[in-house]
């Protein structure tokens, strides 16, 4: 038998897989779930840009993991790199105008997927789970 806490983490991991598969199978506007999350964080940030390391920390990945995800987004023009005028060692990831447009369109599809996954759940339960996840891992906003 395993602890309730360990079972919770296993179920969170399974849920993440279910969510990613659902998003990826629908290929929401050509974006996978991780792509969508990156665009969301950039879209929501001040000036629609972030340092790569800050973006990685915000979404819980390594800097190299974020770089692997950003390269295809950069190739298709959804994000770009911007250097810091004061410090050449610092660069920013910026969501492009086209990236903003695609994100806004994909957000509608993402909301529909979310409703499909969570439609039978009560708002109070969702708030409680959201609070627990925030306590465990922080808020992406």
Segments predicted by a language model, with ranges:
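Alpha-helical linker/hinge and terminal dimerization helices associated
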Residues: 12-15, 19, 23, 59, ...
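C-terminal regulatory/oligomerization modules of transcriptional regulators
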Residues: 1, 123-141
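Short, hydrophobic-biased segments on the C-terminal half of alpha helices
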Residues: 52, 70-71
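N-terminal helix-turn-helix DNA-binding core of bacterial DNA-binding proteins
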Residues: 21-62
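N-terminal leader segment of winged-helix/HTH proteins
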Residues: 1-29
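Charged, amphipathic alpha-helical coiled-coil/dimerization segments
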Residues: 71-128
């Amino acid at each position: 038998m395993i602890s309730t806490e360990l079972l919770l983490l296993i179920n969170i991991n399974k849920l993440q897989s279910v969510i990613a598969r659902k998003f990826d199978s629908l290929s929401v506007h050509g974006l996978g779930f991780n792509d969508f999350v990156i665009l969301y964080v950039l879209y929501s940030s001040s000036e629609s840009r972030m340092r790569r390391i800050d973006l990685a920390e915000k979404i819980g990945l390594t800097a190299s993991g974020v770089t692997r995800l950003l390269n295809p987004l950069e190739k298709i023009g959804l994000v770009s790199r911007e250097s810091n005028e004061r410090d050449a060692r610092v660069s920013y990831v910026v969501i492009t105008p086209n990236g903003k447009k695609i994100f806004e369109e994909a957000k509608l599809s993402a909301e529909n997927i979310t409703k499909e996954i969570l439609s039978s759940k009560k708002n109070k339960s969702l708030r409680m789970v959201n609070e627990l996840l925030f306590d465990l891992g922080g808020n992406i906003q």
